[in-house]
UniProtKB/Swiss-Prot annotation:
It comes from Burkholderia thailandensis (strain ATCC 700388 / DSM 13276 / CCUG 48851 / CIP 106301 / E264). The keyword Metal-binding does not apply. The keyword Protease does not apply. It holds the Pfam family Ribosomal_S21. GO terms for cellular component: ribonucleoprotein complex; ribosome. Belongs to the bacterial ribosomal protein bS21 family. One of its GO terms (biological process) is translation. Residues 38-70 are annotated as: Disordered. InterPro entries: Ribosomal_bS21, Ribosomal_bS21_sf. PANTHER family: MITOCHONDRIAL 28S RIBOSOMAL PROTEIN S21, SMALL RIBOSOMAL SUBUNIT PROTEIN BS21. Residues 45-70 have a biased composition (Basic residues). Keywords: Ribonucleoprotein, Ribosomal protein. This is Small ribosomal subunit protein bS21C.
Amino acid sequence: MTTIILNPNEPVEVALRRFRRSIEKTGLIKELRARTSYEKPTTERKRKKAAAVARLRKQVRRSMPPKKKY
């Protein structure tokens, strides 16, 4: 569970921003959105495989030297 301590003389907006940042870092919002509806195991595997392929393409693209622009 994510908790934050409100510092003295700290505006509520700043504390709320800190709370949202900490929630996002833990990945709680992403997990909640994933659990809102059932995803079949085959669909989940397909989505994860596509994400892995995209990550690999991105990694290869970054490791290549930049193209020369004449």
